[in-house]
C-alpha cells in the first residue's frame, strides 16, 4: 500500500518554514507542550478570526514571541489595540513568561489551505451540502490565483450508513516536486452522524531554488 509523505514536512526549509523557531535541548519537551497550549488558548479565544497558523519564537528562556497569521486581524487587535494587550496579559499570567504578540494579515484567505479546510468544516456542521461547499471553495481558490487545489472529505457523508472518502481536484498538484509551493491544511466537522475529516492541498506555483 502506498504511503504519502506530509506536504509540509517534505518541504521544510525549502519552500515552507517551521512553526516553532527555537531550540532548547534541556527544556525541549516542556517548551513543545507549552507551544501547543499557547496555540490552543489563542485559537479558542479567537475562533472567529480566521487564524491560519501561529508561529512561536523564543529569543531566550523568559520571552515568547507569538506571530498570529489571520484573515481578520481587527478581531485580535481590537479597538486601539485593547484586545491584543488583554491577550498578552492573559498569556503572561497563564505561562509566567514575557509575551510579544504580533499579528500578520492573510491577504487572500481563499487560497490558504488551513482556512479553506476550516471553512468547509464549518459549513458541513451547518448542514450544507458537502459537494456544493467543496466546489465553491475550489472555484474561489482558482479565481484568486491558485494553480491547483484538491479537497478531500472522509466520513459518513450526508449521513450515509457506510463511511467513505470523496475528493475534488482542479488544476495541477505536483506533490512529488520539491520546489512546488504546496499549502496543506486539515480540519474536522462534528456532525450528528460522527466526525468528518477534511484535507486541503493548494498549489501556488514553484519556488526558485
Curated annotation (Swiss-Prot):
Keywords: Ribonucleoprotein, Ribosomal protein, RNA-binding, rRNA-binding. Pfam families: KH_2, Ribosomal_S3_C. Residues 38-107 form the KH type-2 domain. InterPro entries: KH_dom, KH_dom-like_a/b, KH_dom_type_2, KH_sf_prok-type, Ribosomal_S3_C_sf, Ribosomal_uS3_bac-typ, Ribosomal_uS3_C, Ribosomal_uS3_CS. Transmembrane segments: none annotated. GO terms for molecular function: mRNA binding; rRNA binding; structural constituent of ribosome. One of its GO terms (cellular component) is cytosolic small ribosomal subunit. GO terms for biological process: translation. Binds the lower part of the 30S subunit head. Binds mRNA in the 70S ribosome, positioning it for translation. NCBIfam families: rpsC_bact. Part of the 30S ribosomal subunit. Forms a tight complex with proteins S10 and S14. Belongs to the universal ribosomal protein uS3 family. This is Small ribosomal subunit protein uS3. It comes from Thermosipho melanesiensis (strain DSM 12029 / CIP 104789 / BI429). The gene is rpsC.
Amino acid at each position: 500500500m502506498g504511503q504519502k509523505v506530509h506536504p509540509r514536512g517534505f518541504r521544510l526549509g525549502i519552500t515552507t518554514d517551521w512553526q516553532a523557531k527555537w531550540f532548547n535541548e534541556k527544556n525541549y519537551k516542556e517548551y513543545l507542550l507549552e507551544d501547543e497550549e499557547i496555540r490552543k488558548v489563542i485559537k479558542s479565544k479567537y475562533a472567529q478570526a480566521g487564524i491560519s497558523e501561529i508561529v512561536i519564537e523564543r529569543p531566550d528562556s523568559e520571552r515568547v514571541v507569538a506571530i498570529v497569521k489571520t484573515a481578520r486581524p481587527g478581531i485580535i487587535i481590537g479597538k486601539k489595540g485593547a484586545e491584543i494587550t488583554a491577550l498578552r496579559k492573559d498569556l503572561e499570567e497563564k505561562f509566567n513568561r514575557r509575551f510579544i504578540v504580533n499579528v500578520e494579515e492573510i491577504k487572500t484567505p481563499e487560497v490558504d489551505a488551513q482556512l479553506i479546510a476550516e471553512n468547509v468544516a464549518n459549513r458541513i456542521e451547518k448542514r450544507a451540502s458537502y459537494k456544493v461547499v467543496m466546489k465553491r471553495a475550489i472555484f474561489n481558490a482558482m479565481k484568486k490565483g491558485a494553480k491547483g487545489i484538491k479537497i478531500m472529505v472522509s466520513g459518513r457523508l450526508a449521513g450515509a450508513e457506510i463511511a467513505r472518502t470523496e475528493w475534488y481536484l482542479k488544476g495541477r498538484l505536483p506533490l512529488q516536486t520539491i520546489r512546488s509551493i504546496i499549502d496543506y491544511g486539515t480540519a474536522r466537522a462534528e456532525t450528528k452522524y460522527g466526525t468528518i475529516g477534511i484535507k486541503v492541498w493548494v498549489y501556488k506555483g514553484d519556488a526558485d531554488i
